[in-house]
Regions:
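Juxtamembrane/disordered regions of integral membrane proteins
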Residues: 1-158
Length: 158
């Protein structure tokens, strides 16, 4: 892809779909003692109980995170390995920013609640792994998309 921002957006969607499928399978405890899919918790962030809304919000965030990756770290990605590594690091950053700060605060919980509330530690670790995998897949996808775009540009010049 010619544009690093387009590559970042598409890579974010690819990583976001994988992470979203993981969140769909992971359950989080609810205040009433029940449980719900993590994607349902994502929907609650925007005041909805619809899984479709949760998916839409999650994928929108994935695009934004992918574009920010392209802007901030895209120049450091030299190949598949560095793309996956920088992406994994970016995923950890977003686990802290999104999973431990923004999401709990938007749900009326204290910052870092997934690490400190009883019964939430497994959710925090699942979220950590999900963000790590999201980042690695996003970074790898970014590297592949940028490489393919650069090859295409070189062929069109020849």
């Amino acid at each position: 892809m010619n544009s690093k921002f387009t590559a970042g957006a598409v890579a974010g969607i690819i990583g976001g779909i994988v992470f979203g499928m993981m969140m769909q399978m992971m359950n989080a405890p609810t205040p009433d003692g029940g449980s719900m899919p993590m994607m349902g918790m994502v929907a609650k962030v925007v005041g909805s109980s619809s899984l479709a809304v949760g998916w839409a919000y999650h994928l929108l965030n994935s695009v934004v995170i992918g574009v920010l990756f392209a802007l901030i770290l895209g120049g450091r990605v030299g190949g598949k390995g560095s793309g996956a590594a920088w992406g994994a690091a970016w995923g950890i950053v977003w686990w802290i920013v999104g999973g431990l700060l923004i999401m709990p605060l938007m749900l009326g919980m204290p910052a870092f609640a997934p690490l400190t509330m009883p019964g939430m530690q497994s959710v925090a670790m699942g979220s950590f792994m999900g963000h790590l995998i999201f980042g690695a897949i996003m970074g790898l996808s970014f590297a592949l998309l940028r490489h393919a775009g650069q090859e295409g540009m070189q062929r069109s010049r020849a």
